[in-house]
Amino acid sequence: MNQEIMNLFNPTTPAQVFDQIRISIASPEKILSWSYGEIKKPETINYRTFKPERDGLFCARIFGPIKDYECLCGKYKRMKYKGIICEKCSVEVTLSRVRRERMGHIELAAPVAHIWFLKSLPSRIGLLLDMTLKDLERILYFEYYVVLEPGLTALKDRQLLSEEEYLRAQDEYGQDSFTAMIGAEAIRELLKGLELEKLEASLRVEMQETESDIKHKKLAKRLKIVEAFRFSGNKPEWMILTVVPVIPPDLRPLVPLDGGRFATSDLNDLYRRVINRNNRLKRLMELRAPDIIIRNEKRMLQEAVDALFDNGRRGRVITGANKRPLKSLADMLKGKQGRFRQNLLGKRVDYSGRSVITVGPELRLHQCGLPKKMALELFKPFIYSRLDAKGLSTTVKQAKKLVEKERPEVWDILDEVIREHPILLNRAPTLHRLGIQAFEPVLIEGKAIQLHPLVCAAFNADFDGDQMAVHVPLSLEAQLEARVLMMSTNNILHPANGLPIIVPSQDIVLGLYYLSILREGLPGEGKLFGEAAEIEHALHAKVIHLHTKIKYRWEGLDENGKQVSRWYETTAGRTMLGQVLPKSVKMPFDVINKLMTKKEISGVIDQVYRHCGQKETVMFCDRIMALGFYNAFKAGISFGKDDMVVPASKWKTVEDTRTLAKEFEQQYNDGLITHGEKYNKVVDAWSKCTKKISEDMMTEISAVKKNPKGGEAQINSIFMMSNSGARGSQDQMRQLAGMRGLMAKPSGEIIETPIISNFKEGLSVLEYFNSTHGARKGLADTALKTANSGYLTRRLVDVAQDCIITADDCGTKLGIKMRAIIDAGTVVASLASRILGRTAGEDLRDPLTNKVVVKRGTLMEESHVDALQQAGIQEVKIRSALTCELVNGICGKCYGRDLARGTPVNHGEAVGVIAAQSIGEPGTQLTMRTFHIGGAAQINEQSFIESNFDGKVTIKNKAIAKNGEGHLVAMVRNMVVAVTDADGTERATHRIQYGARMRVDEGDMVKRGQRIAEWDPYTRPVLTEVEGIIGFEDLVEGQSISETLDESTGIAKRVVIDWRSQRGGADLRPAIVIKGKDGKILKLARGGEARYMLSVDAILSVDVGAKVKTGDILARISTESAKTRDITGGLPRVAELFEARKPKDAAIIAEISGTIRFGRDYKNKRRISIEPVDTTEETREYLIPKGKHIHLQDGDIVEKGDFIVEGNPAPHDILAIKGIEELAAYLVNEIQEVYRLQGVLINDKHIEVIVRQMLQKVEVTDQGETDMISGEQIDKIEFDQINAKAKEEGKKIATGTPVLLGITKASLQTRSFFSAASFQETTRVLTEAAVNGKVDPLEGLKENVIVGRLIPAGTGASMAKIREVAVKRDKLILDEREKQATIVPSAPEPEPLALPTPEQS
């Protein structure tokens, strides 16, 4: 209590108002100005009296008193002596809190290098002096002397001399003829002697003169650091310390334990070592000890200071008494337990509790059940104040007693207090913002929190022992925000994809599905009913059944909102659903007059939300939840063993496949196919078999059976559960009653022998053993992937945290093009789904009438999208975060619709964090879901193209040949088949693979679903373009070709082997040539000879002397064997894309359009050049490693951006060759691909936001007449600013190219050093920032959390805006007053205007 009174007299200093924070190197003078006194002794506190020793590490004279307002000796006590310094013990009488603020210092007897600037790479001292780290360490740790002033001697400036060389030089030249020093003093002198202006000028000159690339880079680095020191006002010699600051004692406490021992912070030990060694050095210097001893002591001092700043950075780690490394100052900041992440970004909060959750089906959507005991504890302060207000208690003590006794009036007051006071529920792990939601508490008995079933999906909660935490928002503002922004009723849509997340699942779905079933031939079929009451009566009287087909008169509203009645053919159950539907024009009975699966219900909720608003949706959800639960209970659905129907056709299918597998085995034995092909084909056959059995099982289970009376029998329960989406997937049913199918090895390869049994029949021992792989891998993956996914989310949040909506419209004309994504003939993502909720980037016109359908700048709602679909528009230009031109943040138009609200996005919305959560959250979900299918292998390989539309075929770059078998074969790589409709609009374009069999020709009409082309997905062919006779070149047995006898078959097959590794094979160039009748090599139409180069591992399909027709296969190259894909391959893939890593076998991409020419080969590289079509460009050369299959031949024509060597393209190449839009499309599609495989929907805009953050930097290619350095990476914004300035001054501007940074790199290079330091590599970031004297503008979220302010997003953004307005207005008023004061000096003083506070405004 008296603490509070004291605080009244000592008002806390108001919080400083600042806009930015600067970090720089502390000069010795600065350190002394912070200090309150020098620490001379290593003692801490007296172990008997527990009082701090004078001049020691805890000295009260320097740091302040231990008890409030009491000096150490006790002469002065109490407030009245405030500020007096006791003459006996020299301690100032003040608050003990100053011991957290006051610093001390240690005067070093010899200067010491700061290890961060020495060892944190790149070494700043090393760069400035242009010395290697090794040499620096030799000088600093007293091994070598360095020459500072060579004088007239033959020594060079900065030459290193060992002890003997130094002594010899002194003898030779005389002691005073040159100056050489050793240790940190020497380095300090060198740094002091640097003339930065001159150095910078000479470096710039040198850079322009140098030819070598490496040297240029090194000079650029030096120039950058020289500039940094010049502009930041830091002096280079400050990197050498002469004074060491000592942090306040309360930040490195020493606590006495019982038994006379002490627990102490490691820093005290480290400081003690420094002080001991420093004092010893001082004494030795006073005693004029021999040089060698002093030098050793100086080296030890340097090591002690190194350990204090960053223990373990150099040399041995210094350990404490228990062999544990001591935590140095750097370790205090670093890592998860460091100051940044533990205390500044993650704080513990008061007023919280946690308990187990149970289900609360009778709650409303905005409620949760809170145990009375918890409520009483959490709302204590409110209860106390209420008791006081009601006069039931006069003091807090009394109130406490009342509450502890749990008097009846306390419960009444608790009810009052809780009413309309929202509380927050949180379930860890909080992967996205829906992991914390606000509810109104309902008091319940018991000890478990009750949760509404519909919000479980958002929390990812279930009731198998999950726990949740409760938090109480205290202030009125916090309560308001909780109610308006976080209430569960305000979070109906998922921020990741805009679909409802308040969706019934499991029992509710099953109940609703059961309710909406329609079965033929039930009693009472065809009866007419006028209203719901009649139906209810009939049901009770058992005249009709829930599923009976009846006629029903439904009363609704027509388009004009008038009452209308219509007859519907429906069932009794569906009329019940009709009762809970909101009455609206847009909600006819048709919406629910169908079989309700989970997907359908989700659709209905979505429609209700779009047409009837939020309130109706919430009420509707609550009603259908009750209906679903009730009917699931009434239906009493359960299943027995016989409900799992094994299809009758199973064994026949299995036998057929076995025969097929045997055939492939035989073909392999006969040498017709390779081992790899056989493997692929067998695996393929079995997966087809599994699929067929699965389909047969589904048809048998779902078949409508008749009962003896001629009516329909009950529907199979398992089918009902799976079909409704309540529980279980088709895959799980297949494993129960079909066949388990193929299994994967832990390495990801598929085992050739499948598991033929299902769980109903039971597995054989071998099958069981084979299936253990998948199950174990699943469990192991789960553990590993959770961590990986969490780390990915953290990196994403870090890179995107300062992406905030800061304006309505940036006014850009740019945008990106969107079209539907089609894969293997199926539409994977429709154009409609991709452009919904985005802003049109141009006027969209109907291709037939040329009428504008959607104006530029319109936010596309559902109605617009429908109009576009009807007009048949295939491609739409939309605004995107990638092309937004705002300097800070993103504008609302470029972002589009706020997915979680379904409205245009608000100012201050933290879209970056939402994007990161949306991408990261399913990562964890998926990783936890790998083993749901028990590792059953799923293979997907595309091997054909189907038309999605009816239309006419047109072929671009046509080159088709008829081969020996009479099939049409595609002969080029850039052939495109387009399907056009009647009026000539292109509906679809397909790139045709080389060697594909064409099923259509130019001008053919195709129907939807008709095959256009097909190919073997497992091999790549080499085709002949001319008819003739085969000849071999350089195909030498044992050198470039090996005829392998397959052990199992005894049949020879010829494979090209690596000829460069064989003796005498370096100059071979194996190829197949086509000769004419005269034995000469034929010429090709496109120039060049008919010579086909072969790569390693090619399998020959022809023999010397054989006749071939155009389009015949000469050789085949096998592709990789099929691996299973699941998100375990997926998560690393997503990380790889976001980190912009170069893939393992990167594709080589043509940088220009032109003709391929093969050059001379190197030892193990093959040289290819492209002769450009455009003669102004120069020829590009590529060196391709051996063993890579180049599927191009001499003289082929390639387009810019085509692949020369297959593989995954490196994102950097795409950016360089095709530009930003292509890169964005590639990244978005590749990432979406991974998530789509798992059935996860994420809106493209989230990925675009992250990609925008990866493209923030520009690499300067030509510096022009600016201060930038060519080759350096600089922020896009800074780059533009510098260029604008140069333009104003009429100088030549710099040019640059956009650079793609991975998310980790981008996070570390943000403009805010606070954000970067709290992310990773804290030491490096802080060192760099200090050298550059960086200023943190505090724009992002993290920086503001760290300095303890409101974040500039959400309500914080509007507060900041109001404050800005207020400051401007105040300034105007004050300026006005000053003017008046200067005009009329004699006038009486005006009344002060009442300035409204920012809050009022």
From Swiss-Prot:
GO terms for biological process: DNA-templated transcription. Residues 1378-1401 are annotated as: Disordered. It catalyses: RNA(n) + a ribonucleoside 5'-triphosphate = RNA(n+1) + diphosphate. Mg(2+) binds at D462, D464, D466. It holds the Pfam family RNA_pol_Rpb1_4. Zn(2+) 2 binds at C810, C884, C891, C894. GO terms for cellular component: DNA-directed RNA polymerase complex. InterPro entries: DNA-dir_RpoC_beta_prime (IPR045867), DNA-dir_RpoC_beta_prime_bact (IPR012754), RNA_pol_asu (IPR000722), RNA_pol_N (IPR006592), RNA_pol_Rpb1_1 (IPR007080), RNA_pol_Rpb1_3 (IPR007066), RNA_pol_Rpb1_3_sf (IPR042102), RNA_pol_Rpb1_4 (IPR007083). Binds 1 Mg(2+) ion per subunit. Binds 2 Zn(2+) ions per subunit. Belongs to the RNA polymerase beta' chain family. This is DNA-directed RNA polymerase subunit beta'. It comes from Rhodopseudomonas palustris (strain BisB18). The gene is rpoC.
